[in-house]
Amino acid sequence: MTEGVNLDELDQYLSSDESPENCMMLSDLDGLLHGVICSPIPISSDVWMAAGLGAEPKELPNWVVNTLTDRYMEIAQGLAHDPMVVEPIFWQAKAGHLIAMDWCEGFMKAVSLNPKEWLRLSESGSDGHLMTPILLHMIDEQGNLVTSPSVIENLALDTYKKRLDNRPMKDSLEHIRTDKGPRLL
């Protein structure tokens, strides 16, 4: 699905001195977009662009805003498709394995924009368990956070971590696997 959006140009911009100082890199930003789209309540583009790029949309080059809007629509269409089409942007290490942590951090940044709503979702017992694969990339083997989350993100992570501690690993991941790999709602 990502053929329609020029992600190479966006990646170059995000890595350049022209981008805002506090902007996310491409994988983080893609995780943020997925989180915004999956949010229990709508998040305005002004809010998520400022969170992801460290600047208001009016302060950004038009092509950057347009590219992000196109990627947002691409993700939303994939998630609305039956079956869902999810193509997250992960980095690949030189050794060949995928690095999902940056994407997961971006997703959790979206969670931090409406933490109470996400907490309600997790406590409702409906779909909160689907966060398990994302959170697994945020916690090391000893159960410690591998990033420095804000207080709000920490609240959400603690809630999910408690659920992880009370659930066998195989059971927590089994329900989100399909023949084509992991799903994200």
Where would I find each of the regions flagged by the language model?
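Domain-length accessory/inserted modules outside core catalytic folds
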Residues: M1-L185
